[in-house]
Amino acid sequence: MDFGITFPSYIRAYHDVKMAEEYGFTHAWFYDSQMCYSDVYATMALAAEHSRYIKLGTLVSILGNRIAPVTAHSIATINELAPGRVILGVGSGFT
């Protein structure tokens, strides 16, 4: 059985992701709320560097806030740090 946990995208969330991984969580999800938290992709990159197996995903990346190539490049970069552990959740946001 898989268990996920959601975090606000604050830059030090990698500490919490590392702890979640130690407690057996399989997924860590991050809000993409640019006005409230740090950048979701910077947060995920740090989490990728400080974890080993937990999957990392956006919950959700708001398509209207960034042009598609920027989103694709950001998520591809994180996938280089954590191959096969990255999930891009997309949506309109604010729902």
Name each model-derived stretch.
Residues 1-8, 65-95:
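Flexible, glycine-rich active-site loops centered on histidine and acidic residues
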Residues 1-58:
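N-terminal beta1-alpha1-beta2 module of alpha/beta enzyme domains
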Residues 19, 41-46, 63, 70-72, ...:
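Generic preference for flexible, low-structure residues
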Residues 34-35, 61-67:
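Glycine-rich "substrate-gating" loop/helix at the edge of Rossmann-like oxidoreductase active sites
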